[in-house]
Amino acid sequence: MDFLRPASWEEALAAKAEHPAAVPIAGGTDVMVEINFDHRRPEHLMDLNRIGELSEWETGEDGVRLGASVPYTKIMEHLRAELPGLALASHTVASPQIRNRGGVGGNLGTASPAGDAHPALLAAGAEVEAESVRGSRRIPIDDFYTGVKRNALAPDELIRAVHIKKADGPQQFSKVGTRNAMVIAVCAFGIALHPSTRTVRTGIGSAAPTPIRATAAEEFLNAALDEGGFWDNGKIITPSVAKQFADLCAAACNPIDDVRGTASYRRHAVGVMARRTLTWTWESYRGARHLTEGAA
């Protein structure tokens, strides 16, 4: 196995073009486990840790450009206001040591359905900035996951950054595991309210071959909130609406039985998390709305 260590982003792109099968490594929290257990033995391993820009982020007027190697710890500490859903998901990642090393780029590159960042990225409507010597493009997160641990990257492409709009409403993340830390998700759920467009987006992890959105549940909830005037009157969401939303989220899943949980349990857990996170986010929205009205 040859070890490539580019000193710049341009060198990394050139190396990836020359060795399309080279496996990039930054935090190493996924790749090194696979190599240590002999599940993977790439001919070339590309270390990206000398490329400082991958560990940086930029906050613009409307969104955040998050470098592929920004550690989860930094997201928790510095981007909680702009990216609350991703910050909550980051807090659940493994241990402090792994949160100090791992980043969203690795989660996306591995594309495991159990990756903690995926539900939050789906709910926020993120875009993945991919680049090769041929040029750069942005891949909508909805189009990024193409199969079990497969993504939309071309063989010569690397993930440079992730673009995420600043939260314009409450976001939540919930995860079920066999313990509270150092755990691979049995299933996970993310939700984001977007008051500016009067829409709700979801993200589900570890309950289908790929991370997914519960689009039927979103469409139902968007229609129910609009028809009931909930965005304007700030009323409590009725139990029947919350239950139907939860049931549709559970129905969106296509889980398997494995050592971490059964398919039926995963569906049940997703429904519970959907109902709870909807309640939490809507209460936050109502509270913020009442504060705004009181100030006016």
List each language-model region with its residue ranges.
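C-terminal structural segment of proteins
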Residues: 1-296
